[in-house]
Amino acid sequence: MKKSPSVLVIGGGSTGTGIARDLAMRGLDVTLVEKGNLTHGTTGRMHGLLHSGGRYAVSDQPSAKECIEENRVLRRIAGHCVEMTGGLFVQRPEDSDEYFEKKLEGCRECGIPAEVLSAEEAREIEPYLAKDIKRAIKVPDGAVDPFRLCVANAASAVEHGARIETHSEVTDVLVEGGEVVGVEVTHQTGTGPYVHGEPGEVEEIRADYVVNATGAWAGQIGDFAGVNVEVRPSKGVMTIMNTRQVDTVVNRCRPKGDADIIVPHETTCILGTTDEEVEDPEDYPEEGWEVDLMIETLSELVPMLADARTIRSFWGVRPLYEPPGTGTEDPTDITREFFLLDHADRDDLPGMTSIVGGKLTTYRMMAEQISDHVCEKLGVDAECRTADEPLPGSEDFTVLRDYMDDFGLRSPIGRRSAQRLGSRADEVLNSVDPNPVVCECEAVTRAEIQDALDTAGTDLNSVRIQTRASMGNCQGAICCHRMANELAPEYDEKTVRASLDDLYQERWKGERHAMWGTQLSQTALKHMLHAATMNRDEDPAAADADIDFAAFDDGVASGGAVADGGRERAADRADDDALGGADGDN
């Protein structure tokens, strides 16, 4: 039997997992390596917009046309990852009438359904819009869960025979005889079925073809291979509010600018964004003024944002690219199109292609085109099926809205579980009995946590990505330790505590940019719960000295404290004090 050609995909974001799925469905032998969790890079740090294309209808019509086409595809194949909120491009009195008309005309030229609404009609859809807005354009924007989408693509790839290796960092590209023949990876700390090496272990993975799908990090992979990939990373801030101040994507209808979009996402709203070029996608300043800008500017569209509660902020890095010699200075002017860089044609280095640019909405189209390219290189004749075959969990998830009573769940919890799990809800929610809620903010049940642990091992941040547990208002104050409890008794205490610490630190990275008002009070409560009540600042398990538990008081006999509130014991102590102290009391 003839061996299938092998392809190595570098990068576990939406594009990388989409490529792995596409190639695996065509029958190729696929391995994907990712240095962290899936969605470690740009995919896990975006505002969750499913583009209609309206944002690019004036400035970048090729990208706009790609967006509306893929918007329709994703609604069909990934319904459990998408919420069709609709979108509004809102004009304020100071915004240009000419630009408004250009936006409307551009949408229609690109095949994007667009309807003009009066201010009153727009406020019927979103009552909290500013009272002085002029009008709006309605478009089919939506919200997409990038974590769920990425995991679903990876799961489909595995179902079709692909191998996924997380926590495996590429540290070199293997070049022999003037051709790329594979990569060297160094395995990092991690657990679960997708971790295939010991921490620090170095492994060579050889392949017939290598795809560099690392986005903003593509230049670093290019350096390993001795070629120049001119990615221009551009950072943007996103600020998360505690509730959904709007249920529709709200855009400012004006030319390019910072702080011009509000995306309702799950139980929150995400405000975005800035666009500032950086040299290193791993190391750049996260500045408070950027967060302030989001709130101050977008309050002009939705005034209640000025006094709303901010729960965290985070930054992501766009993998922008333009052909050499273009010379664009402002990153907002760089196209959002994607590019395939065939290093055989471009750099006389066969065996590797890089894919750069683009956006999450068009990930599947990007994956299809590079998969066509790889198949042509390898002489494989196989059609793409990813636009027609639903992702795991997406086949018939609407019927799951009736599961609440069956599983003894409060209906909001059942509804949220069905939305997250899609057609897998029956299987997962029946797997644990009893099935209490672990994360109240996001309505995540124990069954969902256990299901996520099947692939996450001890990585609680991976559980967070899959379920949204710890991503609500309290940012894990109430549920983080509950999540860690689910690791016992399979894992020892040291391992569980280390996993819990990693989850806390990941939560803290974004919380520290939102410490004012009500959220500061929430953070103080979280600190008191964990640092004081749970003694996490002075962890006795980490102390060198052994604890003499025999020296502790035995306490009240069972039921005593409930029966008399401890009054009898207090009276005994008072009598002892009056007598100068009894044995053992000093």
UniProtKB/Swiss-Prot annotation:
Pfam families given in the database record: DAO (PF01266), Fer2_BFD (PF04324)
UniProt binding sites for FAD: 6-34
Compartment list: Cell membrane
Known EC number: 1.1.5.3
Membrane-protein topology: Peripheral membrane protein
Record GO terms (molecular function): flavin adenine dinucleotide binding; FMN binding; glycerol-3-phosphate dehydrogenase (quinone) activity
Biased composition (Acidic residues): 574-586
Main location: membrane
NCBIfam families: glycerol3P_GlpA, PRK11101.1
Name listed for the protein in its UniProt record: Anaerobic glycerol-3-phosphate dehydrogenase subunit A1
